[in-house]
């Protein structure tokens, strides 16, 4: 497992890291659909989540556009999609307990499931855990992010 300042990045998934878009997203493919969520780094930066407002199932999303809005005591913002696609499922459990994103970002705290418009293009923007750790290192240092 890759790690940055105590923030884990499981190697069984891919990552979309784009600081300009505030995108620190993981993605895991199953049967042509990607489950996406916040990395532990993003969850730590946001703070304890108090609200989760997903877009509607069936909605088309563009790369870097919101699949959901999340809110903590210190931050409100979008969860960007790593690629163009369609939202096929949202995590209903987060509506009642958004802090699952903080407690279990790579499990029960997933954000949405997105079917990419172009699967090959989707995979081309994602990186493995080691590359994600490399990209996240300067951000974690600059912002003083710690996990665990």
Swiss-Prot record:
Binds 1 lipoyl cofactor covalently. Residues 33-115 form the Lipoyl-binding domain. PANTHER family: GLYCINE CLEAVAGE SYSTEM H PROTEIN, GLYCINE CLEAVAGE SYSTEM H PROTEIN-RELATED. Keywords: Lipoyl. One of its GO terms (cellular component) is cytosol. InterPro entries: 2-oxoA_DH_lipoyl-BS, Biotin_lipoyl, GCV_H, GCV_H/Fam206, Single_hybrid_motif. The glycine cleavage system is composed of four proteins: P, T, L and H. Belongs to the GcvH family. CDD domains: GCS_H. Its cofactor is (R)-lipoate. This is Glycine cleavage system H protein 5. The keyword Repressor does not apply. The glycine cleavage system catalyzes the degradation of glycine. The H protein shuttles the methylamine group of glycine from the P protein to the T protein.
């Amino acid at each position: 497992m890759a790690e940055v300042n105590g923030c884990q990045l499981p190697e069984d998934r891919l990552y979309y890291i784009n600081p300009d878009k505030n995108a620190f997203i993981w993605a895991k493919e199953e049967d042509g659909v990607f489950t996406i969520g916040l990395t532990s780094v993003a969850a730590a930066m946001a703070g304890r989540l108090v609200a989760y407002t997903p877009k509607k199932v069936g909605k088309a999303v563009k790369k870097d556009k919101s699949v959901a809005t999340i809110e903590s005591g210190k931050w409100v913002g979008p969860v960007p999609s790593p690629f163009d696609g369609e939202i096929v499922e949202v995590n209903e459990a987060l509506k009642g307990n958004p802090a699952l994103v903080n407690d279990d970002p790579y499990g029960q705290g997933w954000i949405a499931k997105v079917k990419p418009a172009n699967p090959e293009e989707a995979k081309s923007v994602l990186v493995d855990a080691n590359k994600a750790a490399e990209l996240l290192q300067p951000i974690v240092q600059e912002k003083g992010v710690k996990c665990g």
